Amino acid sequence: MLISSVKVGEHFYFTLGVFKLHAQVFIVSFFVILILILFSVLGTNKMSQTPRGLQNFLEYVLEFIQDITKSQIGEPHYRDWVPFIGTLFLFIFVSNWSGALIPWKMIILPEGELSAPTNDINTTAALALLTSLAYFYAGISKKGLRYFSRYIKPTPILLPINILEDFTKPLSLSFRLFGNILADELVVSVLTLLVPLIVPLPVMMLGLFASSIQALIFATLAAAYIGEAIEEH
C-alpha cells in the first residue's frame, strides 16, 4: 500500500471569468436553494385563511423561527431580523439533511466528490462571517459610534479580551458546524462500507437529529449575538 500516493483534499473547480469557483459546494448549494424556493412557491401559491398541507407546515416553520428570534433579540427589534435568522436556519438545515439523505458520492466528478455544503469549511466560515457583519451592523445602526464603547466596559483593561471575543465568535460558529457535519458524514460512510445493511440506518437517523440540532444552535447563537449587540447596557 502506497500511502504517499493518496491525494487528500481534491476538489472540482470551474472558472467564471477571472474567478476560480469551488464547483462541489456551488452545485449542492444551488440544489439546496432550489429546494427552498420550490417549497416556498408551492406553499404560498394558493394561500387560504384556513391553512392546510404545505402552507400549514410553512407557517409552523415561520412561527418556530420567529420564536427563536424573539427569545434572543426581543421586542421590538426581532421582526427586522426574522428573515436573516430564518435564511441561516433553513439553508443550514436543508444542507445538513441533504448530506445525510442524498447519496452525493454516487455522482462521479472529474475530481473530488459532492457532499453537503456545510461539510466544507469555506461555507461555514462564510456563514459565520455574515453573522459577524450582521451583529456589527445591528449594533452600529442602533447605537452609532457608541457601540464601540462596549470594548472598554466594564473596565478598559478588558479591551484586548473584548476585541479577541469578536474573532472567536465566527471561529467557534464555523468550526462547530463544520466539524459536526464532517464527522457525521465520515461515520456514516465508514459504517456503510463495513456493515452496509444494518448499522447505517440508525446512525443516519442519529445524524439527521444532530444535523437539525446544529442548524438550531447556529441560528440561536446568531440571534443571541445580534441581541447582545443592540442591547442597552
UniProtKB/Swiss-Prot annotation:
GO terms for cellular component: chloroplast thylakoid membrane; plasma membrane; proton-transporting ATP synthase complex. InterPro entries: ATP_syn_F0_a_bact/chloroplast, ATP_synth_F0_asu, ATP_synth_F0_asu_AS, F0_ATP_A_sf. It is found in: Plastid, Chloroplast thylakoid membrane. It is a multi-pass membrane protein. Keywords: ATP synthesis, CF(0), Chloroplast, Hydrogen ion transport, Ion transport, Membrane, Plastid, Thylakoid, Transmembrane, Transmembrane helix, Transport. PROSITE patterns: ATPASE_A. F-type ATPases have 2 components, CF(1) - the catalytic core - and CF(0) - the membrane proton channel. CF(1) has five subunits: alpha(3), beta(3), gamma(1), delta(1), epsilon(1). CF(0) has four main subunits: a, b, b' and c. This is ATP synthase subunit a, chloroplastic. It comes from Galdieria sulphuraria (Red alga).
